[in-house]
């Protein structure tokens, strides 16, 4: 699989081409330390609230070096190695790795000017199995039952396929 591009717009275009029509694909452009970025995740698989808390906590601990960062690679290095982000954050370098982490329920921060992303372990997966509905016995066909909200059903289905 190809490496991530240092251009944020190219990475977002690839992701939108792959997942843009999915109802649960979430992409939000942000600015961190004067650097454009984007948060990408699957709603229902990753906790958006946990992600915002994690990022706000890390960003609120400003150091003088963070105010003078020249670009995405420096912001990446400072966030991943010199901030209060937990150990469950790790670098993402390829498109294959990015899609694997997204479909595993992780959120990824992409930065303009950096050919890597930061994956955050903020999964909020529903842990129930997909099983046959108790009230409907089928002799033929599919025996899976999806009785939750659409985004919960999508996350269960993504986990089942994975």
Can you name each region flagged by the protein language model?
Residues 1-162:
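Membrane-embedded alpha-helical signal segments
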